[in-house]
């Protein structure tokens, strides 16, 4: 990780869960991390904790609604002005709405598309352009995906969500191919976890907290820190090694 010391990483959805754990890990390794979310209160608290702990890097909170392209473009413009640009882009932000294919609300589907697919695509484009204009040839774009992007589970409330995650799988491989065509050594990686103990299930089942709690009680889940360790592993790979996809489940998880 030495080559990343002092360089700039963008982590979307950095206020809680996987995003917060990844942001903390990168700061621990000396990176300058821009952590964005719709609300930055928790990121500001995390930044203070990192500073108090004496971590060599810094965490810069940035308020951004990833469903709004103008806000994304404004964020990248600010990063360029204040920090020159992005060297690592970690597209972590994602959400699910309990909207089945046969009866779901269009608004919920559109929200998932906007955040899980469009925001990932826009951030990827802008991160690449930031790297290109500064002749950065060793940058990295990491998409935090899901095992739902590799298999469809028999739960109607996550079928549309699964479709958006299949899109992330395709986008990551398409990105890898386009980067090769562009004759650059910028790398693209997809990290696909199974069940991670975060607040994700409580947001999905916001009207049924008992069901959400049962999701995490059924097996010993992955932790957000496991995902952060996977990100560090990917970034630590030698420049000639392209890690395309990491699929990781809790040992006890079946599907």
UniProtKB/Swiss-Prot annotation:
Binding site for NADP(+): 13-18, 38-39, 44, 65-66, 92, 161, 165, 196-199, 203
Catalytic residue list: 161
Pathway: Steroid biosynthesis; estrogen biosynthesis
GO biological process: estrogen biosynthetic process
Signal peptide from the UniProt entry: 1-23
Bilayer-crossing regions: none
Record localization: Secreted
Gene Ontology terms: cellular component: extracellular region
InterPro entries (alphabetical): NAD(P)-bd_dom_sf, Sc_DH/Rdtase_CS, SDR_fam
Main location: secreted
Its biological purpose: Catalyzes the conversion of the 17-keto group of estrone, 4- and 5-androstenes and 5-alpha-androstanes into their 17-beta-hydroxyl metabolites and the conversion of the 3-keto group of 3-, 3,17- and 3,20- diketosteroids into their 3-hydroxyl metabolites. Exhibits reductive 3-beta-hydroxysteroid dehydrogenase activity toward 5-beta-androstanes, 5-beta-pregnanes, 4-pregnenes and bile acids. May also reduce endogenous and exogenous alpha-dicarbonyl compounds and xenobiotic alicyclic ketones.
Family of this protein: Belongs to the short-chain dehydrogenases/reductases (SDR) family.
Protein's recorded name: Dehydrogenase/reductase SDR family member 11
Species of origin: Gallus gallus (Chicken)
Gene, per the UniProt record: DHRS11
């Amino acid at each position: 990780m030495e080559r990343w010391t002092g360089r700039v990483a963008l982590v979307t959805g950095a206020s809680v869960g996987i995003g917060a754990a990844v942001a903390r890990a990168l700061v621990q390794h000396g990176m300058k991390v821009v952590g964005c979310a719709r609300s930055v209160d928790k990121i500001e608290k995390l930044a203070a904790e990192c500073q108090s702990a004496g971590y060599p890097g810094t965490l810069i909170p940035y308020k951004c609604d990833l469903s709004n392209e103008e806000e994304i473009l404004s964020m990248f413009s600010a990063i360029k002005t204040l920090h020159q640009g992005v060297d690592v882009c970690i597209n972590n932000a994602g959400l699910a709405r309990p909207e089945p294919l046969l009866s779901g609300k269009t608004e919920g589907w559109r929200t998932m598309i906007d955040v899980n697919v469009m925001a990932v695509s826009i951030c990827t484009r802008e991160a690449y352009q930031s790297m290109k204009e500064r002749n950065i040839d060793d940058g990295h774009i990491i998409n935090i995906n899901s095992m739902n992007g590799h298999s469809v589970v028999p739960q109607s409330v996550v079928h549309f969500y699964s479709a958006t995650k299949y899109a992330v799988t395709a986008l990551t491989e398409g990105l890898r191919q386009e980067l090769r065509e562009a004759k650059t050594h910028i790398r693209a990686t997809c990290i696909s976890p199974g069940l991670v103990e975060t607040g994700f299930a409580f947001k999905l089942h916001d009207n049924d907290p008992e069901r959400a709690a049962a999701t995490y009680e059924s097996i010993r889940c992955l932790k957000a820190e496991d995902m952060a360790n996977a990100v560090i592993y990917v970034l630590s790979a030698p420049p000639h090694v392209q890690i395309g996809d990491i699929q990781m489940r809790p040992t006890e998880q079946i599907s």
